[in-house]
Amino acid sequence: MIRFTPSITHPVPVPGWKRFVDVTACMVALPVFALFTLVMTLVMQFASPGPVFFRQERVGYRGRRFMCYKFRTMIVDADSQTHQRHCDGMILSNAPMTKMDARRDSRVIPGGWLLRASGLDELPQLINVLQGDMSLVGPRPCVPYEYEKYLPRQRERFCAMPGLTGLWQVSGKNRTTFEEMVRLDVHYAQNLSWWLDLKIILMTAPALVLQISDTSRARKSSAENTPVYAPVIRATNASDGLPGS
C-alpha cells in the first residue's frame, strides 16, 4: 500500500498492476461498448438528432488536460454557462453537489438523465482508459473552469490517475459536499492499492442504484415545486461537448 503525502509535482506513480487491469478490463468490455454504441446511435435519431458522442476537455493526472469522451445526453449546442454558474455555487457554498439534471434541466435530452445517473453516458471513457489518460478507478476529471476555482490543497486530488469510478462516487457522491469530495479523493491517492480498487469496483453497482433513486426523487420533487431550467442555445460546434460529472 502506498502511504505518503502526494502533490501535483510529486504525484502517485501509476502501478503496473493498475495499468494491466485497466487494459484487460477494457478489452473485455469493448464488445459491450460497441453494442451499446449501436443502440445509442439508433435511439439518438429519435430522441435528439445529432452526434452520438461528444468530446470535452478535462483536467486529470497532474493537472494535465485531455479530451474526454461521453455519450451525448444534452441538446446540441446547449449553453455551458448555466453549468459553470452551478459549479461555482457548489464550490463556494460547499453545499451537497446536486447535479443539474436532478433539477429537471431541460437541456438534457429525453432519457438522458437516466444515462447520466446510471453512469452509462461515461462508457466511451473506456477509450480514455486505453489511451492512458484515465483508469477504471480514480478521482473524476473536472472541466478546466472548475479546476481554476480550486485552491492549491484541493488540487491534490489530481495527483492520482482519474477514473470512471472512485472512492467519492461510492461514498455518497451527490450527497457529499465539494470539500468531502476532495478529502475522499486525496485519501484514495494516499492509500492506493489493488485491494482498495477492488472494493470500490464492487461498491460501484449499489452506489449507482442509489444515485438513480436519488435523482429520480429529486426530479419528482423539482417538478412539483420548481420550474425547469430553460435551455439556452449558443452558436458552437456540436462536438465541443458539454460540462458533465
What residues fall within each predicted segment?
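A hydrophobic, helix-centered structural microdomain
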Residues: 5-81, 152, 194, 199-245
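Hydrophobic structural segments characteristic of membrane proteins
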Residues: 1-4, 102, 116-117, 123-245
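Short, glycine-rich, amphipathic interfacial segments at transmembrane boundaries or analogous
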Residues: 53-106, 165-183
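Aromatic-acidic/polar surface patches that form glycan- and anion
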Residues: 13-17, 32, 100-107, 116, ...
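Short, cationic motifs built from Arg/Lys/His that form the positively charged side of catalytic pockets
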Residues: 19, 58-60, 64-74, 107, ...
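Short, motif-level signal for alpha-helix interfacial/capping segments enriched in acidic residues
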Residues: 1-2, 13-14, 97
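A residue-level structural signature of the nucleotidyltransferase/glycosyltransferase Rossmann-like core
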Residues: 31, 51, 66, 106, ...
